């Protein structure tokens, strides 16, 4: 009897923060694959308005969410940027378990993996008007409700790390502080 090869997918994102659209995408990818590697991209960046959370904080957001959803067939891998696009896929391969298929809508990521002969699939956009990291961060800064845009464990992590205060402070300029 021939055993079936496990099909493993790769997804990369900054997840600043991990939101309900990301969760839906993970579920859809897992409906087509046995397991998923979630690359926490730009892992070296934190404490900026665009990248307010550390790789470790994003890891907590994602792992707690997936645990609550009873999803266990995943790997979380922090992936730092490299300054040479031609080397990036090799960098990813060195950091992750082997994978068969890549899911992305990013044109550069798509191109780089296709050049290395990976199967690359597009992701469905889920409630893109509300569920984007940029929009959620803007809501946090403006004091608007954002909690319904992210899974409950993400809300908990952001409160634990005082993330709202952090992103609001990061969004001010030195002129704001001196006035």
Curated annotation (Swiss-Prot):
It catalyses: beta-nicotinamide D-ribonucleotide + ATP + H(+) = diphosphate + NAD(+). GO terms for biological process: NAD biosynthetic process. Pathway: Cofactor biosynthesis; NAD(+) biosynthesis; NAD(+) from nicotinamide D-ribonucleotide: step 1/1. CDD domains: NMNAT_Archaea. Its EC number is 2.7.7.1. This is Nicotinamide-nucleotide adenylyltransferase. Disulfide bonds: none annotated. It comes from Thermoplasma acidophilum (strain ATCC 25905 / DSM 1728 / JCM 9062 / NBRC 15155 / AMRC-C165). One of its GO terms (molecular function) is ATP binding. The keyword Transmembrane helix does not apply. The lineage of its organism: Archaea, Methanobacteriati, Thermoplasmatota, Thermoplasmata, Thermoplasmatales. It holds the Pfam family CTP_transf_like. It is found in: Cytoplasm. One of its GO terms (cellular component) is cytoplasm. It comes from the Archaea. Belongs to the archaeal NMN adenylyltransferase family. Keywords: ATP-binding, Cytoplasm, NAD, Nucleotide-binding, Nucleotidyltransferase, Pyridine nucleotide biosynthesis, Transferase.
